[in-house]
Amino acid sequence: MYSVLKQSIRPRLLATHNQFRTMITAQAVLYTQHGEPKDVLFTQSFEIDDDNLAPNEVIVKTLGSPINPSDINQIQGVYPSKPAKTTGFGTAEPAAPCGNEGLFEVIKVGSNVSSLEAGDWVIPSHVNFGTWRTHALGNDDDFIKLPNPAQSKANGKPNGLTINQGATISVNPLTAYLMLTHYVKLTPGKDWFIQNGGTSAVGKYASQIGKLLNFNSISVIRDRPNLDEVVASLKELGATQVITEDQNNSKEFGPTIKEWIKQSGGEAKLALNCVGGKSSTGIARKLNNNGLMLTYGGMSFQPVTIPTSLYIFKNFTSAGFWVTELLKNNKELKTSTLNQIIAWYEEGKLTDAKSIETLYDGTKPLHELYQDGVANSKDGKQLITY
């Protein structure tokens, strides 16, 4: 897989052997050295010859690309998966592209490409594609097709994907779905999963998907002044029960949870941990025998500590979950999971986690827009649209 960035400003005509060919000016956000995004990012311009595509090549323009914590960690050099550095963008020294998630629209395909055509929406099929850019050039197998709104409408679907849904589809919703379905068989209508980080994007997707699959769920959240309002909103999304971290860690509240599970006739078989520390200990204790806890984050920056007794007497299992590793060599699993998420979006059964959208209009350098987004990430997920 390879990629080249570009930005659609205006095709430029070049005379070559008495013929004219068009070049598309392109831009991308790169870095040559790891560090803080505010210090190391820059915008690189270059051109793509769109009149001389190889048979399997595809040119796409960006519709939107979000800023994820993993993107920031890659730039800092602390994320296990990193994009390769290259001089293919026209830089004097090797540079790496930023961004892992993004939604693109096909604008031109090579003569051998039959799976895609102009106007199709696509996302990268591989990790480390580099999505903080205006356009990209790749092979047809570098992309997975998503239905654009017109195609959804033509297929009789009540809803088409939004740019936010398409641009953010490959991390959080897939993480939630795969954790709920890929490791433990939960009996619909009976069994339970418990998760901390209930107000996080993955937590909200897990609550919704759990309800769609008829799984019972307990979401653990931090206490807050508007607790009743937040609890009501999470239950409306699909959480069966919502408790606070204090209740999660309270021995006195334990019998209440056991009674919920008993009344359903099932078991608590799965825990989803993105916090760590005593929160992870609390949700692990709620599981029945042979339970599994998947850790996919560590927002508290505290280690996961599990009592030895859970391993010995309850045959407890603790494992990590990293969607990138699971899907990097399994395009079929990624595609089938995407198809399920897309179907729920089209049917209006799944609500996406909203992003704070900023339009790139060329008034400031592209990398500054992403630097602003990184700085504003504390206010919510940032999505740069084009």
From Swiss-Prot:
Keyword Magnesium in record: no
CDD domains linked: ETR
Transmembrane regions: none
PANTHER family: ENOYL-[ACYL-CARRIER-PROTEIN] REDUCTASE, MITOCHONDRIAL
Active-site residues, Swiss-Prot/TrEMBL: 79 (proton donor)
Transit peptide: 1-22
A Pfam family recorded for this sequence: ADH_N
Record's subcellular location: Mitochondrion
Assembly notes: Homodimer and heterodimer with ETR1.
Conditions for induction: Up-regulated by growth on oleic acid.
Enzyme Commission number, as recorded: 1.3.1.104
GO biological process terms on file: fatty acid biosynthetic process; fatty acid metabolic process
Protein task: Required for respiration and the maintenance of the mitochondrial compartment. Oxidoreductase with a preference for short and medium chain substrates, including trans-2-hexenoyl-CoA (C6), trans-2-decenoyl-CoA (C10), and trans-2-hexadecenoyl-CoA (C16). May play a role in mitochondrial fatty acid synthesis.
SUPFAM superfamilies linked: GroES-like, NAD(P)-binding Rossmann-fold domains
UniProt: NADP(+) binding residues: 172, 199-202, 222-224, 296-299, 321-323, 381
Homology family: Belongs to the zinc-containing alcohol dehydrogenase family. Quinone oxidoreductase subfamily.
Cellular compartments per GO CC: mitochondrion
Catalysed reactions, as listed in the record: a 2,3-saturated acyl-[ACP] + NADP(+) = a (2E)-enoyl-[ACP] + NADPH + H(+)
GO molecular function annotation: enoyl-[acyl-carrier-protein] reductase (NADPH) activity; trans-2-enoyl-CoA reductase (NADPH) activity
Alphabetically ordered keywords of this record: Fatty acid biosynthesis, Fatty acid metabolism, Lipid biosynthesis, Lipid metabolism, Mitochondrion, NADP, Oxidoreductase, Transit peptide
UniProt entry tagged with the keyword Iron: no
Protein's name in the database: Enoyl-[acyl-carrier-protein] reductase 2, mitochondrial
